[in-house]
Amino acid sequence: PDGRNAAAKAFDLITPTVRKGCCSNPACILNNPNQCG
């Protein structure tokens, strides 16, 4: 029952790192416009 919550927490931890790394890379920004806004 707790699996989805744990996954959401893990995603919240991972996302800022992805955002920083990806959004400093123009090619990645183009591939992930919703993450880099």
UniProtKB/Swiss-Prot annotation:
Keywords: Acetylcholine receptor inhibiting toxin, Amidation, Cleavage on pair of basic residues, Disulfide bond, Ion channel impairing toxin, Neurotoxin, Postsynaptic neurotoxin, Secreted, Toxin. Changing Q35A: 6-fold decrease in ability to inhibit alpha-3-beta-2 nAChR, decrease in ability to inhibit alpha-6/alpha-3-beta-2-beta-3 nAChR, and loss of ability to inhibit alpha-3-beta-4 nAChR. The lineage of its organism: Eukaryota, Metazoa, Spiralia, Lophotrochozoa, Mollusca. The modification Cysteine amide is found at C36. Residues 1-20 form a propeptide. It comes from the Eukaryota. This is Conotoxin Bt1.8. It comes from Conus betulinus (Beech cone). Disulfide bonds join C22-C28, C23-C36. One of its GO terms (molecular function) is ion channel regulator activity.
